[in-house]
Amino acid sequence: MTTLKIKTDKVEKPLNKEALIADKQTVKTPKEKMDNSGRFYATGKRKNAIARVWLKPGKGQVIVNKKSLDQYFASETQVKTILQPFTLTKTNNQYDIVCTVRGGGISGQKGAILHGISKALAQSAPDFHAVLRKGGFLTRDSRVVERKKYGQHKARKKTQFSKR
């Protein structure tokens, strides 16, 4: 029986307790994406919709595709769900928001704006990150429409089966 000897170029260093403690204490914080005019930028996605969100300190004005939030979304419940991150972090009427949304329908665009606002809020104040994560606003909803398969009526619906 032959034995193989493996040569390694790496020299193992003795473990340093201080280095290990320093590694454990480093916590991931979201990167600041602030532009020159003091706005926080984030992108949100939901289904086929992509929202680009700019957040800056202000009076609580929300503009979506050059329209006010009430003009863009007809339903009051949609407006309330978009503003949920502010009620959760208790920052109502403290930030101005400008969004551009493309693709998808109204529901997907609403979810994309909500996701983008949450990410921008988490960048503006690091202590909001844990609150928004716990509320489920920072996780991207990855559910998308399943594609239609050939030989079938829809994605899952098949033609009626006849035994005889």
UniProtKB/Swiss-Prot annotation:
Any Gene Ontology CC annotation: cytosolic small ribosomal subunit
Any one of the GO BP annotations: translation
UniProt entry keywords in alphabetical sequence: Ribonucleoprotein, Ribosomal protein
Keyword Cytoplasm: no
InterPro entries from the UniProt entry: Ribosomal_Su5_D2-typ_SF, Ribosomal_uS9, Ribosomal_uS9_bac/plastid, Ribosomal_uS9_CS, Ribsml_uS5_D2-typ_fold_subgr
One Pfam entry name: Ribosomal_S9
Gene Ontology terms, MF aspect: RNA binding; structural constituent of ribosome
Family that this chain belongs to: Belongs to the universal ribosomal protein uS9 family.
HAMAP family: Ribosomal_uS9_B
Name of the featured protein: Small ribosomal subunit protein uS9
Species of origin: Rickettsia bellii (strain OSU 85-389)
Upper taxonomic lineage: Bacteria, Pseudomonadati, Pseudomonadota, Alphaproteobacteria, Rickettsiales
Gene: rpsI
